[in-house]
Amino acid sequence: MFTPNGMAFSPDGRTMYLSDSHPKSQLIWAFDYDITTGAPSNQRVFVDMNPLPGRPDGATVDTDGCYWICANDAGLIHRFTPQGKLDCSHEVPVKKPSMCSFGGADMKTLYITSIRPAHIDLSDQPLAGGVFALRLNAQGMTETPFKPN
């Protein structure tokens, strides 16, 4: 793994997802996850993003167990089913979405951050570096805080 990114967990906490954003990889991995010990096992390819536009970046999971990931360099957010099938894609007004997370009172708003590279011509992407909200029918989950022993 070159550039780990896109860590998220299934609703039951028993599957951990991790993407590799490096252009030579562009894979999203799934692991069995032991919620008692915190040990991942059974690494397998969940999605190969090479045939899709964009590189995998930040991600989250909804209550249906679907994995949402920013497609950096493509201006898209992809949603994959728990079986790894592309369910839908949503456009955002920038080329480099970087992270997504559900929020709002009903957890049905997907908030998306973006990157504003130093060399960018803002006349091409005036909203680069902005944060966007996408209203969805899908519902997110609150994140489980880390509790060190």
Model-derived features with residue positions:
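A short loop-to-beta-strand structural motif that recurs across blades of beta-propeller domains
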Residues: 27-29, 76-78, 127-132
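Flexible "stalk/tail and boundary" regions
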Residues: 78-89, 95-96, 104, 110, ...
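Beta-rich, blade/repeat-based domains predominating
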Residues: 1-18, 27, 48-66, 94-108, ...
